[in-house]
Swiss-Prot record:
UniProt-recorded name of the protein: Elongation factor Tu
Task of the protein: GTP hydrolase that promotes the GTP-dependent binding of aminoacyl-tRNA to the A-site of ribosomes during protein biosynthesis.
Region (G2): 60-64
PANTHER family, per the entry: ELONGATION FACTOR TU, MITOCHONDRIAL, ELONGATION FACTOR TU-RELATED
Species of the source: Thiobacillus denitrificans (strain ATCC 25259 / T1)
GO CC annotation terms, alphabetical: cytosol
UniProt keyword list: Cytoplasm, Elongation factor, GTP-binding, Hydrolase, Magnesium, Metal-binding, Nucleotide-binding, Protein biosynthesis
Gene that this sequence comes from: tuf1
Record carries keyword rRNA processing: no
Length: 396
């Protein structure tokens, strides 16, 4: 069956469901696709179609995720739902599915549970910018005061992890009732309300091409009589011939000028996000640029050696370590195109980290790397991946 053509007419936003096991994330996902497909077109997905999600690999880690899409009047949404808690942890840390916003599902009957807290913390650590709450299973609660209590608890929990708890949209409903076609407030109308909250509360994400120019250096060679050419894939922004750029990371930052952009051996006047290009640099020697550095718009990114991160450590079954690691562990951190050695400081009270765990750590690299908060990396030992992580906060 041929895939339907992807209409690029509406702005595209990435979202996903998060929350405690059995609070109804997958049922809600099914309800959203079913109800919005009736109203705006698109494909309805049943619970079991979403639940039997295929495995995918991100940075060498196998993750189960279900991808569905749906439309509202003004937007196109790509939505990810994970079957198991471990899949969420891996998904959010590797950035396999970057989220512009998340729908936190909380059972009205149970209130916030341990994974509710953990998913909010993860969302904060990995830089999910917006959370909307769907208080599910409202048909199981008769007492309005109890619903208010759960709502208060959820708002407090969000505020505790630096989300604006007081201003977060909270929609009360029952995904199951909505799927059954119930027309009361907690049925179908609650899903329409949720869609409206997605449209209004999550701002339209900035497109990669509109961000400041950045290109990781993959290869460097000199062309006699023309100078040094750096090749790579433009990660964001646009580079035009004649523009000043900085070479950032590993060695002290230097400025240079782009004197040419080529793609498939053709000269262009610019390269943009997504293009694989060669950038010709004026007056730069071949030995002054190396893999692991980035070319960037001057002042847009700085090199750093110390940061805190959230990491997931591969289990033995995933091809990771067989033994735990301890404070002071020194693996390689693979950023964009190269490995840099760094040492790990564990949080107070954490003796060791077992394969299969996720943990917040502090890292000191032996060489500075161009980084922003939210940058993903792999943790490697002798070339094999033993973990994945994301920069949560830059220290220096």
């Amino acid at each position: 069956m041929a895939k339907e053509k992807f209409e690029r007419t509406k702005p595209h936003v990435n979202v996903g469901t998060i929350g405690h096991v059995d609070h109804g994330k997958t049922t809600l996902t099914a309800a959203i696709t079913t109800i919005l497909s009736k109203k705006f077109g698109g494909a309805a997905k049943k619970y079991d179609e979403i639940d039997s999600s295929p495995e995918e690999k991100a940075r060498g880690i196998t993750i189960n995720t279900a991808h569905v899409e749906y439309e509202t009047a003004s937007r196109h949404y790509a939505h990810v739902d994970c079957p198991g808690h471990a899949d969420y942890v891996k998904n959010m840390i590797t950035g396999a599915a970057q989220m512009d916003g998340a729908i936190l599902v909380v059972s009205s009957a149970d209130g916030p549970m341990p994974q509710t807290r953990e998913h909010i913390l993860l969302a904060r650590q990995v830089g999910v910018p917006y959370i909307i709450v769907y208080m599910n299973k409202a048909d199981m609660v008769d007492d309005a005061e109890l619903l208010e209590l759960v709502e208060m608890e959820v708002r407090e929990l969000l505020s505790k992890y630096d989300f604006p708890g007081d201003d977060t949209p909270i929609i009360v409903g029952s995904a199951l009732k909505a799927l059954e076609g119930d027309q009361s407030d907690i049925g179908e109308p609650s899903i329409i309300k949720l869609a409206e909250a997605l449209d209004t509360y999550i701002p339209e994400p900035e497109r990669a091409i509109d961000k400041p120019f950045l290109m990781p250096v993959e290869d460097v060679f000199s062309i006699s009589g023309r100078g040094t050419v750096v090749t790579g894939r433009v990660e964001r922004g646009v580079i035009k011939v004649g523009e000043e750029i900085e070479i950032v990371g590993i060695t002290p930052t230097v400025k240079t000028t782009c004197t040419g952009v080529e793609m498939f051996r053709k000269l262009l006047d610019q390269g943009q996000a997504g293009d694989n290009v060669g950038v010709l640099l004026r007056g730069t020697k071949r030995e002054e640029v190396q893999r692991g550095q980035v070319l960037a718009k001057p002042g847009s990114i700085k090199p750093h050696t110390k940061f805190s991160a959230e990491i997931y450590v591969l289990s033995k079954d995933e091809g990771g370590r067989h033994t735990p690691f301890f404070n002071g562990y020194r693996p390689q951190f693979y950023f964009r195109t190269t490995d840099v050695t760094g040492s790990i400081e564990l949080p107070a009270g954490t003796e060791m980290v077992m394969p299969g765990d996720n943990v917040s750590i502090k890292v000191s690299l032996i060489q500075p790397i161009a980084m922003d908060e939210g940058l993903r990396f792999a943790i490697r030992e002798g070339g094999r991946t033993v973990g994945a992580g994301v920069v949560a906060k830059i220290e220096e």
